[in-house]
């Protein structure tokens, strides 16, 4: 078996295992159980972020305590700025800045973006966690569709990029990512969203549009973490997931696209109220 086929098989087995857990939790667990899972996942993501950095243990402990306070104070922060907390808006702002630098500045990301900058990790992962808490209270099928839409984009980009990719999209930022892979991911995602809109009553036209608008940010999450890893001199953020690397390697696109999904949803619903 070729190395490419072996890698794809390993990634597929891991993806199926993760998908089974995610589907079971989203469709059959209570809000409390799902929120506990989201909290544990977010904590693991932040621990992995800190493990890649070269900061002192004292600094890591301080930020770890701060992170736990943030995600455990969801009701407090959510009550300040309903339905999006102030922390979430800061995280979304960071992703908008990242998107601007990727698409309009040829991928020249700010030097402030690094694994050693715990403030960035704190904001982005906290925003992801708080948005997931918010989405759990809505239709579970829509939440599942959002998660799988991003996974479909990643899978389509990976398969097409590996087999047909020739032209780098942003060679200085991530030379292995290709234009062909990007197109493959976008087409796969668009097909998935159309099917979700046609066959799932929980996915309204507005929901479908938010899923489409969020996909460029899935790309941003992917490129952003590629930049961070290149800057830190590491290939993966961990090794817990066979074929994928670390948790951050698996959910890098979700960290960006899920908060932006809620942002666009609120934006479109607000705009719709004026017409």
Positions of the model-derived regions?
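Membrane-embedded alpha-helical bundles of polytopic integral membrane proteins
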Residues: 2-178, 182-213
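Short helical (or helix-break) motifs at transmembrane helix termini and adjacent helical loops
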Residues: 152-162, 218-230
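Juxtamembrane boundary at the C-terminal end of a transmembrane helix
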Residues: 264-275
